[in-house]
């Protein structure tokens, strides 16, 4: 059943005639503006894709964005799901599995973190 749902999601995305992504990027909080650098973007709301769950965080877009950046085909995930929102691990990871099956060879998961370091201190 899981494979059928993944195939349905892929069929829906391919019906939109998007370029097959080489890289998938999950945009962390505060990084949503990266989409403005994408050339020829195609926006797909999670609700339009079989098996995708809605993003409940107000600042998360709940979209996949397909396009290019410096000549590389990308799939950006703007908004992500969390276990603490009540989603299962299977639901949280479903979009990642879809992006992989679409053709993404590399996955970058980003996040934003904050600190209370004094000026000129570095965290590695």
Predicted regions and their residues:
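Single conserved hydrophobic/aromatic residue that forms the stacking wall/gate
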Residues: 116, 123-124
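Metabolite-binding pocket within alpha/beta catalytic cores that recognizes anionic/polar moieties
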Residues: 2-118
């Amino acid at each position: 059943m899981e494979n059928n749902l993944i195939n349905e999601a892929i069929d829906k995305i391919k019906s939109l005639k998007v370029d097959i992504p080489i890289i998938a990027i999950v945009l962390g909080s505060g990084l949503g503006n990266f989409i403005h650098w994408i050339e020829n973007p195609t926006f797909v709301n999670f609700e339009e894709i079989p098996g995708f769950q809605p993003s409940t965080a107000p600042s998360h877009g709940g979209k996949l964005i397909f396009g290019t950046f410096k000549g590389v085909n990308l799939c950006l995930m703007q908004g992500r799901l969390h276990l603490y929102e009540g989603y299962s691990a299977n639901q949280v990871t479903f979009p990642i599995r879809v992006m992989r099956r679409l053709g993404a060879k590399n996955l970058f998961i980003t996040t934003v973190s904050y600190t209370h370091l004094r000026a000129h201190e570095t965290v590695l």
